[in-house]
């Protein structure tokens, strides 16, 4: 069904495949710098703002609670409670 290739034909085929692969790899690296993607003009276009987001005062503290770790929830709850006056 398939024909056996001669040594020179095998060498030519391997060289052609290598050259084609090298050409496409080089083109893949070079073309984005020559023809930049028009969708990437502003890198912040795909960010979404939180609908409940409000501008915070300059000296305010933000506490981030990690839901996966029980230790961080404990630390955050201690930070939220003001110290008791004795």
From Swiss-Prot:
Primary location recorded for the protein, binned into one broad class: mitochondrion
Role this protein plays: Required for efficient assembly of cytochrome c oxidase in the mitochondrial inner membrane.
Protein name per Swiss-Prot or TrEMBL: Cytochrome c oxidase assembly factor 2
Signal peptide: none
Protein transport recorded as keyword: no
Family: Belongs to the COA2 family.
Top-level taxon: Eukaryota
Effect of disrupting the coding gene: Elongated cellular morphology at division.
Subcellular location: Mitochondrion inner membrane
UniProt keyword Thylakoid, yes or no: no
Pfam family, one: COA2
Species assigned in the record: Schizosaccharomyces pombe (strain 972 / ATCC 24843)
GO process annotations (BP): mitochondrial cytochrome c oxidase assembly
GO cellular component: mitochondrial inner membrane; mitochondrial matrix
Keywords, in A-Z order: Membrane, Mitochondrion, Mitochondrion inner membrane
Mode of membrane association: Peripheral membrane protein
């Amino acid at each position: 069904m398939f024909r056996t290739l001669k040594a020179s034909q095998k060498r030519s085929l391997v060289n052609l495949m290598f050259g084609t692969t090298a050409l496409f790899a080089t083109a893949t690296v070079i073309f984005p710098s020559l023809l930049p993607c028009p969708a990437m003009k502003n890198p912040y276009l795909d960010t979404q703002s939180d609908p409940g987001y409000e501008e915070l005062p300059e000296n305010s503290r933000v506490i981030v609670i990690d839901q996966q770790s029980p230790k961080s929830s404990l630390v955050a709850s201690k930070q939220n409670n003001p110290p008791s006056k004795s």
